[in-house]
UniProtKB/Swiss-Prot annotation:
The keyword Protein transport does not apply. Belongs to the Fmt family. The lineage of its organism: Bacteria, Bacillati, Bacillota, Bacilli, Lactobacillales. Its EC number is 2.1.2.9. This is Methionyl-tRNA formyltransferase. GO terms for molecular function: methionyl-tRNA formyltransferase activity. The keyword Transferase applies. GO terms for cellular component: cytosol. It catalyses: L-methionyl-tRNA(fMet) + (6R)-10-formyltetrahydrofolate = N-formyl-L-methionyl-tRNA(fMet) + (6S)-5,6,7,8-tetrahydrofolate + H(+). PANTHER family: METHIONYL-TRNA FORMYLTRANSFERASE, METHIONYL-TRNA FORMYLTRANSFERASE, MITOCHONDRIAL. It comes from Lacticaseibacillus casei (strain BL23).
Length: 318
């Protein structure tokens, strides 16, 4: 039985771990991020991967920082055949990668060499890509730079957001890994070096990027909203109040009003201007301190004062 140390943290990694267990790989330990406080009540919560490991009585290691930790020494001493990672969230020291008797591999959520880094799914949606995918690569010291063993593609549509794509890619990644590992173990897998001229990066989304730019064309604005959904949500300042836009529909009609202005408003519909004289319909939003609302609920409640012609979204809260 091939022994594995598995590293992962979010829901994306859970089907991959479950797949390895189902295929009778010997999971010596699971390494995941420490429990974090979540939600308004700031309750301590285990990562999805930790929860999955505990269901199978697999030992769990949770170093705050892996490098130089007792958990690192413990993992190296296990001398696994394979190290498998999927969205773990920490840098892996070279001496740990070298502890694998066969190889250390990573399931990465993009079609490498495009989108190395921590937010490949968000950037693929944000940039309006027609497809994304997963890549099985060798783990090396340089981030996401190892040779590629396999790729699988996934079409993207306007119905997708980061949540839906995460779910689809986790299953695609599981299947691709389970198909590829036997070839890697047997030494028959083909290695393809990444083309350095085609490398792009997808750094972790910053707080500043959550502030939506109303001067973008409506199509690009929609892409940003979907890229930031469902976890954080993108926001604007609507009448000076921080308001999250959860769903919009770009429209074909244009408008000469300034970006952030209301083109049309009735009890059930709100049409606004984005950049380059494009327009969009607001479908779902969330005023500060309140729950998500349909546009009808908003217009018949907190948004009653809005009228056509007003410029209500501004770059700053003043």
């Amino acid at each position: 039985m091939t022994s594995v140390i598995f590293l992962g943290t979010p829901e994306f990694a859970v089907p991959i771990l479950e797949g390895l267990i189902a295929q009778h790989y010997d999971i010596l330990a699971v390494m995941t991020q420490p429990d974090r406080k979540v939600g308004r009540k700031q309750r301590l919560a285990a990562s999805p991967v930790k929860q999955a490991a505990q269901k199978h009585d697999i030992p769990v290691l949770q170093p705050e920082k892996l490098s130089g930790s007792p958990e690192l020494a413990q993992a190296i001493a296990m001398a696994p055949d394979l190290i498998v990672t999927a969205a773990y969230g920490q840098f892996l020291p070279t001496k740990f990668l070298e502890a694998a008797k066969i190889i250390a591999v990573n399931v990465h959520g993009s079609l490498l060499p495009k989108y190395r880094g921590g937010a490949p799914i968000q950037y693929s949606i944000m940039n309006g890509d027609s497809e994304t995918g997963v890549t099985i690569i060798e783990m090396v010291k340089k981030m996401d730079a190892g040779d590629m063993f396999a790729q699988a593609k996934l079409p993207l549509t306007r119905a997708d957001d980061t949540g839906t794509v995460f779910a689809k890619l986790s299953l695609l990644g599981r299947d691709l890994l389970l198909e590829t590992l036997p070839k890697i173990i047997a030494g028959t897998a083909t290695r393809t070096p990444q083309d350095p001229d085609k490398v792009t990066f997808s750094p972790t989304i910053t707080k500043e990027q959550e502030h939506l730019n109303i001067h973008l064309p409506a199509k690009a604005l929609d892409q940003w909203i979907r890229a930031l959904r469902p976890d954080v949500g993108g926001y604007v300042y609507l009448n000076g109040q921080r308001t999250k836009l959860w769903a919009i529909t770009p429209l074909s009609a244009g408008s000469t009003l300034p970006a952030g202005s209301i083109v049309e408003r009735d009890k059930h519909r709100l049409v606004m201007v984005a950049g380059q004289q494009t327009t969009f319909q607001v479908d779902e939003l969330q005023p500060a301190g309140k729950a998500k609302q349909s546009i009808a609920d908003f217009l018949n409640g907190p948004g009653q004062q809005l009228v056509s012609g007003q410029q209500v979204i501004t770059d700053d809260p003043e």
